Amino acid sequence: MLKIGSHVSMSGKHMLLAASKEAVSYGANTFMIYTGAPQNTRRKKIEDLNIEAGRAHMKENGIDEIVVHAPYIINIGNTTNPATFELGVDFLRSEIERTAAIGARQIVLHPGAHVGAGAETGIKKIIEGLNEVIVPGQNVQIALETMAGKGSECGRSFEELAEIIAGVTHNEHLSVCFDTCHTHDAGYDVANDFDGVLNEFDKIVGIDRIKVLHVNDSKNIKGARKDRHENIGFGEIGFDALQYIVHHEQLADIPKILETPYVGEDKKNKKPPYRFEIEMLKEKQFDKELLEKISAQ
């Protein structure tokens, strides 16, 4: 069965329950959350996440698998500022605890940025950080995200991800989040030869490592290294390629998560596209009037 959803908000007093209700309103049967704002480390106590009510609502609506995304501020690739590295290690540990408490098995992580020290140095630091964070027997996997190669990001090639995974002692606790926009922006031909890209990934990393799929179109041409998401079918990857990926038999059991932009001219009143994009992908039929329909909701 197709597992498809989007990023939803976990906030206010209802927290996980609010996230589940938002996902259901989009026709989703999975979803992804941040445990708090992605730009900071302020987090509620686990007992304040409203987990019991949230899980009950999920069960009522057939949602059995969700994903957590670690905040952007974690950078365990930083070799120039020890405080940044230590913050990343400590906070990732606590995020894994929250992920386990919520009942998610995957926490998506941007591997890290070398901030000018070079990819080789950054990758060594990421390996060091992951070896510090991972506890043997933990029931949460860290899903390293395929990156676009913007700035000094590490993980922009399958080889870099494979190097990180190989360096981690308990790498059974590592998986991969395959982002279509990032991989396209990194230079892989996701739009025209996804099977070729997937075969290359399988040879270098192993297809069984993919546990989350971020489904995004791209505003940029292949290899631009920009990381700018576009609505499904309105970017450089295109609807045909993305619906092929979403329904790919080798990725059938993997949760597909949309992170596409809100729509509308009024910056203060943009509308979420997810209900419309999920329906369109389920029906395998591109709707060229989709953006107008989203704006009109």
UniProtKB/Swiss-Prot annotation:
One Gene Ontology molecular-function label: phosphoric diester hydrolase activity
Cofactors, names only: Zn(2+)
Source species, domain of life: Bacteria
Keyword line: DNA damage, DNA repair, Endonuclease, Hydrolase, Metal-binding, Nuclease, Zinc
A biological process from GO: base-excision repair
Positions contributing to Zn(2+) 3 binding: 182, 227, 229
Annotated binding of Zn(2+) 1, by residue: 69, 110, 145
Statement: the UniProt record of this protein carries the keyword Phosphoprotein: no
Keyword Hydrolase part of the UniProt annotation: yes
Recorded coiled-coil stretches: none
Reactions the enzyme catalyzes: Endonucleolytic cleavage to 5'-phosphooligonucleotide end-products
Residues the entry annotates as binding Zn(2+) 2: 145, 179, 214, 259
CDD domains listed in its UniProt record: AP2Ec
InterPro entries per the UniProt record, alphabetical: AP_endonuc_2, AP_endonuc_F2_Zn_BS, Xyl_isomerase-like_sf, Xyl_isomerase-like_TIM-brl
Enzyme class: hydrolase
Entry EC no(s): 3.1.21.2
Cofactor binding note of this UniProt entry: Binds 3 Zn(2+) ions.
Similarity comment: Belongs to the AP endonuclease 2 family.
HAMAP family: Nfo
NCBIfam families linked: nfo, PRK01060.1-1
Function per UniProt: Endonuclease IV plays a role in DNA repair. It cleaves phosphodiester bonds at apurinic or apyrimidinic (AP) sites, generating a 3'-hydroxyl group and a 5'-terminal sugar phosphate.
Name this polypeptide is given: Probable endonuclease 4
Annotated organism of origin: Bacillus velezensis (strain DSM 23117 / BGSC 10A6 / LMG 26770 / FZB42)
Recorded name of the encoding gene: nfo
